Every structure is written in structure tokens, then in C-alpha cells.
Amino acid sequence: PLSSYFKLYPFVVYDNKQVVGRFGITVYPNDVTAYLGFYECIDRDAVAKVIFEEAEKFAGELGCERMEGPVDASFWIKYRLKINLFDRLPYTGEPYNKEYYLKQFTDNGFRISQHYTSNFYEPLAAENEDSLYDNRLAMFTEKGYEIKSPDIKDYDVVLGQLYKLLTELYSDFPIYKDLSEEDFRKVFNSYRYILNLTMVKMAYFKEQPVGFLVSVPDYGNKVYHLDNPMNLLKILKLKKKPKQYVMLYMGVDQSHRGLGKALAGSIMEELRKNGLPSIGALARDGKVTQKYGEDYIDQLYEYVLLEKNVTKIYKREG
């Protein structure tokens, strides 16, 4: 549903008829940035050099002034480069790549422009109450806020509420691009089949949606291979009995300061009940969500976004 928003140019690199790398260049109307993504390369500096030189040359021929990556076509698909904890299996929603890719990017003129973290939290004991988050939840409840999990019969309504909140609150994120509500629904409609709605929270004030926190059971990369019947069975099993949860999306209307900790408190209540570990996924440096539950953080995943100006010799004249 997103292909109408951009133009994607795919490339494959061969050495003696053997595939040694691939990449894609994505461009958007009225945007001077070329987005480099779908990056794969063997561990050979010479091959990486060819990829980045060809990518920059092509971006320049298109009239672009800079490159940013890795971005697999869209903010709504996948972006960022993983840079640590490669001994751990990928969690759902995690960008995953070879450990040496960072060096290949930086050796070829890219610099880190954004840094992100994911927090891995150990299970919360049932008796382990947290006064900060519990008190914040109680305080907002007393003020008339309602924080609750949606009912599956209301999924379509809640999806519309999420669209309005998420597209407004995420609009200042790097590489963010708008999309229509119709296409948003196409992207997120299938989530109804993988969510446990007890771990999805919506916040309302005077019956208006003002915040959200969306968690999914950790399916690893199985949700990307739904054509495999065995994966479908594993997904159904994990949905019924998750091993951990991934908190993928969170946002609060800026006129309701402090509500984020109340939303976090409502999820902590659920985590105390189920006794499962969790991951607070992909928070950008400077965002308050990076610090949520910091007393319970066991490990810290790190990711980056990189950029490079297109060299003058590659730029299209006029």
C-alpha cells in the first residue's frame, strides 16, 4: 500500500556471477534526500566501496543532495542500523543486520545522525510495586482520565484514533513521511491477529483519545514469514503463551504532560500479572521514554541512522 508514495530503484552487485551485495535507493517527491536501504554486503571492503560509490553517483544523478540510511523505502517499513548485542535473537520490529555494516557505512563517508536505544526489562515480580508509576496512574485516574485496553470489536475505531494521534505525534521524527488513513489501515489492519489487547492501552480524557501504548508478543521474525504454515502455528502458540513483550509504539498528546508515566504504569500492572520480560523498543535519544523504568533495565540495545552529503562531482547540474 505504500509504493505509491515513493520511487524505489533496486541494485544487485555481482562478482564473477556471484551475488556479493545489494541495495536500494528510494526517493520521494519534493525531497532532496536519497534513502539508502535494503543493504546487504559480504564482509569485503572493496565490495562495500563499490556499493556506496554507485549509490552516491546514482543519488547525484537523480538530483539529490544527501543520502540517509539504512532506510528500507519508508519510515513505516524499516529503518536504523543495529550496532550491538548481536548475540541475541532479533525481536519483533527490530532492525537486524550484520555486525560489520556500521564500519562499512562509516568507512565510506557516512556519519551518525541519530542514535536510538531499546531497553530490555527483566520480569517484574507481582509484589514489586513502583510508587512513581503507580502513583502517576492513580493521579490521572482521579483527574478523570480513562486508561484501558480496547475491545476487539472496537478495533477499527481505535485504529482511526491511533492514526490521528500517531501521525501527529511522530511527524517530527527523522525520515517521517505522511500517509493517508486508508493506507495506514492497510498497514496496521493485520495487527489485530497478533496483538494481545490486554497489552495495548489507550488513554482518554473527556472521551477524547490523548495517548496510546502498543505492545506485541515477541514473535521474533516469524511474523515476516506468514506464508510458512509452521510459522503460523508458532505465532498462534506464542500469542497464546508469549515469552516476552515488545512495546513498539507510544505517544501522548503534548497538552497532557505526565500521562506517559501513567500509561507505563498501566502496562507495568499487566507485566506484574504475567511475570514476563519486556522490551521498550527504539526510543530516540532525548525522548523521555528512554528513561522509563530505568531501575529495571537489564540490557541496552543500540541503533543508529546515518547520513552523507552527495559529493559535488556526482550532483546533477541545473
List each model region and its residues.
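A conserved beta-strand-loop-helix scaffold within acyl/acetyltransferase catalytic domains
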Residues: P1-D31, S149-M250
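Catalytic cores of nucleotide-enabled group-transfer and carboxylate-activating enzymes in metabolic
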Residues: P1-F23, Y28-Y35, C41-I42, A46, ...
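Beta-sheet entry/capping signal
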Residues: P10, R22, T33, C64-P70, ...
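Short, flexible loop/turn elements at secondary-structure junctions
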Residues: D15, V27-P29, E40-D43, V71-A73, ...
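Acyl-donor binding region in acyl/amide transferases
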Residues: D31-G109, P229-D295
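Flexible loop/turn segments at secondary-structure boundaries
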Residues: F75-I77, K186, P209-G211, D218-Y224, ...
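Acyltransferase donor/substrate-recognition loop-hinge adjacent to the catalytic core
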Residues: P95-F173
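C-terminal "cap" of GNAT-fold acetyltransferases
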Residues: F120-R136, L300-G318
